[in-house]
Amino acid sequence: MKFLISEAIYENKISSLHKIQKSTIYMLGAIIGDIAGSVYEFSNTKDYNFEMFPPGSNFTDDTVMTMAVAEWAMKNDINAEADVQTHLLEETMVDMAINVPCPMGGYGGGFHTWLFHPERLIDYRTGKSASARCPYNSCGNGSAMRTSAIGWLYGDMETTLRVAETAATITHNHPEGIKGAQAVSAAIFLARNGASKVDIKEFITAKFHYNLDTPWEYLHKTYGWNSSCQGTVPQAIISFLTSDDFESAIRRAISIGGDSDTLACITGSIAEAYYKSIPEYMVEKAMSLIPVRFKKVLEMMGEKGYCYDKNIL
């Protein structure tokens, strides 16, 4: 199939990339999108020229869990037993949630219970109380919004998709929850390795069967709240595909309405990898809001991942 051919082409490009310098801090696209959309999540705007970062803008649970997955991925041994990998991920996510409370919004009901009240979990497979934290068959967009680091860290598509599945299934083990996480990670992987928008679209369509042909203008007129992967990820990718630069991608994602911070978080993560440039004022805003722990995660990502040539700071 065509996506298999594309996969091979883009994997071959990795050898021409170089490791970024330790001073580089990157992977801010997801964070900036989250912050930009934070005030519009429950007060949607359809105005493309909305105010960027109005008073009250801040990072949300989307950023907290993005950083948790990034921190885990850099410590994780992908060759370890599955339960070892998921146990480390669980520890990292819970630790991050406890020690870095999100200043805006909160966690979705099921995920909040999983994080803070595992004793209340019901194992959906048996209908009985769970003896420990377990996945809850969610197809929510939380699995997709937290996976951007995975698109940056690995040298081949197969590993990228496998790790994205691990990051999703600890909570979101519904097929759509897994697919959403993998699609976002794959799009970032392709974008950072020089794939064109046409190629990214063709790969995602063939591999994940998302409809990416819906005109953005139609979404702008008709789209509303949807917190599922299948109702968020395609729309976020379309916002990227129809954009002209990083900022226009964020504006397109937010101005269709819906789950604005998550849409822009996903769109921003792909747009950064593709455009390899972020406006300085957006970088400054994000860096002024995130805690030291997040900055350290970003610095570590710069040491372990591939990135574009020009430092954004």
Predicted regions and their residues:
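Structured, active/binding-site neighborhoods that engage oxygen-rich ligands
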Residues: M1-L313
